[in-house]
Amino acid sequence: MHHEDPLGSLFCRDLNWVSTGQVTSEEAVLGQGNISCGSWIENRRDDNPLAATRTAWVLGFITAFNQYGAKPQRDVSGGKDTEVLMARIDDHCKRHPLDNLYKASAALVDELRQ
């Protein structure tokens, strides 16, 4: 006889509502999202060509959220320009240098959603 655990079902259902900022170590992060915030800050400071690639990664992350994230928001950035968005990533990375770019980007989206 199979007995459903109502508390377990509730717990699993509630996991679907975890914000993007609460990322588990099991998230599949591809490409530039794996670099550390320390590297992000260093490359932005040195005007390294990698900074443009990493900026494009963050913009792609935001675009993907706009496409596949919670609706009805069309543009979570609210039309902010790239420099404003990157300044917010800079701020997060200065405060959390051990985070990766994915976590900083997820935190930015969470902040923009509020």
Predicted regions and their residues:
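Secreted/extracellular small peptides and ectodomain modules produced from precursors
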Residues: L10-F11, I35, D91
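Intrinsically disordered, low-complexity cationic segments
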Residues: M1-H2, R95
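Bacterial Sec-dependent signal peptides at the C-terminal "C-region" and cleavage site
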Residues: C12-S25
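Short, compact, well-ordered microdomains
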Residues: E83-L112
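Short N-proximal segments of mature Sec-exported proteins
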Residues: S25-R88
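Bacterial N-terminal signal peptides
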Residues: E4, S9-D14
